[in-house]
């Protein structure tokens, strides 16, 4: 199915218009230690948090995919007999099930096509774009300029007494369910692991405006939205016989407000090679370590 997607680079350009400069630092990332994980065919499905946009080395410009993202690190550590990383920046659940267009406008088949009957491990990290992640960040960053101490973003998304973002999470639930059920049909014997999302904002307090341009009173609100999304993913995984890998907890204290040498997720102006508000190489390493630990538990 060819359809318009929310191009990550368009969203990044919108955010970058708020910034005065950018900086990039190439990280050296160590491969995680070996773990007792499935060593057969491994297929990685997901969005930009999986693909690793702008993290060197980019091996697929249509999907902005790095060969140092967490699936690549896990596959190397596990010694997977074959490996297919079909994650793609901007992907939604529809892209997994039906296909869509990449960042360069090149049409892609369904990510699900990579899952074969002999697949032994499938990882899935999806849902952020189903709720409109890039648009939310852009809206909230722009709104913060006029009310940095207030809650302009929360006010917008809860106007009329209905939390639109919680409603989006609820609407995404059956879509994630459909993905997991399709994966199970395609690979009945595979171990399926659903990953949540790492901390973008501090786990406590009111953030670090203007370094991360989210208004102070909006930080607790958006933090709660991310936790609700992760909780939904955990619940759907459990209900469909999949394992949930928590990457939020190990990322606490490594959010976008932290120093460039500590953070897993970049802010508006990346100080490490990564897209704005996306994991850097350290974040991909951290998610790989968390995934391996979960597989070995």
Annotate each predicted stretch with a short phrase.
Residues 121-124, 147-184, 193, 197-244:
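Conserved N-terminal glycine/acidic-rich loop preference
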Residues 90-109, 256-271:
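Charged, often glycine-rich, active-site loop that binds/positions anionic groups
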Residues 198-297:
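Catalytic His-Asp segment of secreted/periplasmic serine-dependent ester chemistry enzymes
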Residues 1-35:
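Secretory targeting and sorting signals
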Residues 53-55, 105-167, 199:
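Oxyanion-hole/transition-state-stabilizing segment in secreted/luminal serine hydrolases
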Residues 41-46, 50-51, 82-87, 120-125, ...:
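Structural recognition of the beta-strand scaffold that forms the well-ordered cores
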Residues 31-41, 106-123, 176-191, 292:
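Short amphipathic alpha-helices and their capping/turn segments at secondary-structure boundaries
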Residues 35-90, 141-147:
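Serine-esterase "nucleophile elbow" of acetyl-processing enzymes
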